[in-house]
From Swiss-Prot:
The gene is arnE. Residues 40-109 form the EamA domain. InterPro entries: EamA_dom, Flippase_ArnE, Small_drug/metabolite_transptr. It comes from the Bacteria. This is Probable 4-amino-4-deoxy-L-arabinose-phosphoundecaprenol flippase subunit ArnE. Coiled coil: none annotated. Pathway: Bacterial outer membrane biogenesis; lipopolysaccharide biosynthesis. Heterodimer of ArnE and ArnF. It comes from Sodalis glossinidius (strain morsitans). Keywords: Cell inner membrane, Cell membrane, Lipid A biosynthesis, Lipid biosynthesis, Lipid metabolism, Lipopolysaccharide biosynthesis, Membrane, Transmembrane, Transmembrane helix, Transport. GO terms for molecular function: carbohydrate derivative transmembrane transporter activity.
Length: 111
């Protein structure tokens, strides 16, 4: 159950950050300002929801276990940006992502 909640925090946070990226990519103009504000508002809702779930998780899981698992957010954001915007992922970046996943697996086995 805790794994799922921590993963939910990562998903909400990832979605919020992707909404920020989408808002930042909007060009200037009156219609674009509404578009940007809408995506930023969605981002705030997602990140706020992530924070509330995260606080609930921290009440029940040692921070030494929970926080490293939250680093999966780096992996999710990178993969989503690659898929959505075709952002490049270098070999070194990919190796770093694999190390993050391996570290999370090593540290999260006690849950």
């Amino acid at each position: 159950m805790m794994y799922l909640l921590i993963f939910l925090v990562s998903l909400l946070s990832c979605a919020g950050q992707l909404c920020q990226k989408h808002a930042a990519g909007a060009s200037s103009g009156a219609g674009e300002l509404r578009h940007r504000v809408r995506w930023l508002a969605i981002s705030l809702l997602l990140l706020g929801g992530a924070m509330l779930v995260w606080l609930w998780v921290l009440q029940r899981v040692p921070v030494g276990i929970a926080y490293p698992m939250f680093s999966l957010n780096f992996v999710l954001v990178t993969l989503a940006a690659r898929w959505l915007w075709r952002e490049p992922v270098s070999l070194r970046h990919g190796c770093g992502l694999l190390l993050i996943v391996a570290g999370v697996m090593c540290m999260g086995v006690n849950l």
